[in-house]
Amino acid sequence: MNEEKRRQLWKIIVEAGDYLQGQLPDHPNHPKGRNSYAHVAICIKSKFNQSYKDIDDSKFNEVVKYIEYLKKNPS
């Protein structure tokens, strides 16, 4: 992904992490609470099989839609 889109996407990831703060369900492996920013990044990596930085520019809108889905469906 080019630098401009990568920065835009990181800003969207941070905003999603802010939004999800305190909304993720409790998990026994995270007694102090879950990291919502890491959650978004890990979900992106899991779905697209690569870091958000390495995803092709052509999938930018698809990644943004997926982040919106994550915000609506905290898990």
For each feature predicted by the language model, list its residue ranges.
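Positively charged, phosphate-engaging catalytic surfaces used for nucleic-acid and nucleotide handling
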Residues: 1-75
